[in-house]
């Protein structure tokens, strides 16, 4: 999660700053209440089956996978703390990459508890407070600013140019333990009721008068807006910032050289939401299938744009951090940025109005 403003491309080489829309539910209506009362369901695009597929085939399994990855990272760092060998260091780094990849696939549904209860910030704030992190080892994690914990704080210590010291290794275990706690907490909030209903139930109750989503389209708007925001962030900020300034250290996972994997997993997460499931094939009632049935021209356009964006992302030479300055690298990055922005634009201009 990047917490600064975003750059967007205008023409080929001109850039300007726009704010990211991270939590907006409605466009074209003045406020949430107006959205629910005034934005009619002119198209029966979103069904209960669409929402259930999104929740049970994508969101919950993805978060369960993230929690498992965080647990494995914590265990790998505990092993490395006890036996600081080169092999254990590499195993811990690989565990971080795996957990990170899984997390990046959830960027397009970072609403609900991830946003409102602070899980996203606690796990993925960037940039981090590097100076503060150096002095934070003795501070309880729950008392820290988000910029001193999470994936990128672990990355900073684990992938440093010099091997982690004893103090660093101890600190890494503390950070990983908190990451696991946050990831498991996010799973719990989606699956289990406490003083509040499970967020899974909140979304599945869409269309009920007492629901946070009084119409199916209200839930559909949340889902589509999440896709728009995530892909817009990838194009305008995660890629756009470093591309504009030609400063590789502005890539979010610069220290680990994992940025390209981040971006590819952002694409994969959006593709999973569009298809309504994480495995191969199209889930019944998915956004993709509903568009194919009701708006086949839009569906065909999106399918092609997703494919083009994937091809462009996978064509960027690795690592992106060291290839940005090369002519080939710059062209490849710009091509990918343009392709991803096209997907976001179609979702925003052609799909979002159908669910408002």
Curated annotation (Swiss-Prot):
Briefly describe its induction: By iron deprivation.
**Which cellular compartments is it found in?**
Cell inner membrane
Q: Which CDD domains match?
A: Imelysin-like_IrpA
CC annotations in GO: plasma membrane
Q: Which UniProt keywords apply?
A: Cell inner membrane, Cell membrane, Iron, Membrane, Signal, Transmembrane
Its primary localisation, in coarse terms, equals: membrane
Query: From which residue to which does the signal peptide run?
Result: 1-44
Extract the ranges annotated as region (Hydrophilic).
75-145, 240-310
Transmembrane residue ranges? none
Q: How does it assemble?
A: The iron-regulated protein A is one unit of the protein complex CPVI-4, which is synthesized under iron deficient conditions.
Function in brief:
IrpA occurs under iron-deficient growth conditions in cyanobacterium Synechococcus and disappears in cells recovering from iron starvation. It seems to be involved in iron acquisition, uptake or storage.
| Protein name from the UniProt record | Iron-regulated protein A
């Amino acid at each position: 999660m990047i917490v600064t403003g975003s750059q967007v491309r205008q023409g080929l080489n001109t850039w300007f700053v726009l704010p990211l829309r991270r939590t907006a539910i409605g466009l074209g209506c003045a406020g949430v209440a107006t959205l629910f009362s005034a934005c009619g369901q002119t198209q029966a695009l979103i069904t209960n089956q669409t929402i259930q597929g999104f929740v049970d085939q994508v969101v919950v399994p993805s978060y369960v996978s993230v929690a498992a990855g965080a647990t494995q990272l914590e265990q790998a760092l505990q092993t490395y703390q006890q036996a600081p060998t080169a092999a254990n260091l590499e195993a811990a780094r690989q565990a971080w990459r795996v957990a990170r990849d899984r997390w990046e696939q959830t960027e397009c549904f970072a609403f609900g508890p991830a946003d409102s209860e602070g899980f996203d910030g606690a796990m993925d704030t960037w940039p981090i407070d590097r100076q503060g992190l150096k002095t934070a080892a003795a501070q309880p994690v729950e008392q820290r600013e988000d910029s001193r914990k999470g994936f990128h704080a672990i990355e900073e210590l684990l992938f440093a140019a010099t091997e982690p010291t004893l103090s660093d290794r101890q600190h890494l275990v503390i950070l990983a333990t908190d990451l696991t706690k946050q990831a498991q907490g996010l799973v719990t909030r989606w699956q289990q009721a406490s003083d509040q209903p499970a967020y899974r139930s909140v979304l599945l109750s869409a269309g009920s008068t007492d629901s946070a989503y009084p119409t199916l389209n209200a839930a559909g708007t949340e889902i589509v807006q999440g896709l728009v925001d995530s892909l817009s962030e990838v194009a305008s900020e995660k890629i756009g910032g470093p591309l504009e300034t030609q400063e590789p250290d502005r890539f979010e996972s610069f220290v680990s050289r994992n940025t390209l994997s981040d971006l590819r997993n952002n694409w994969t997460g959006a593709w999973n939401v569009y298809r309504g499931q994480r495995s191969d094939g199209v889930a019944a009632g998915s956004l993709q299938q509903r568009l194919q049935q009701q708006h086949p021209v839009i569906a065909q356009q999106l399918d092609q744009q997703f494919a083009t964006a994937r091809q462009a992302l996978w064509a960027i030479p690795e690592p992106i951090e060291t290839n940005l300055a090369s002519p080939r690298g710059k062209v490849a990055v710009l091509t990918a940025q343009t392709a991803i922005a096209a997907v976001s634009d179609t979702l925003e201009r052609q799909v979002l109005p159908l669910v408002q």
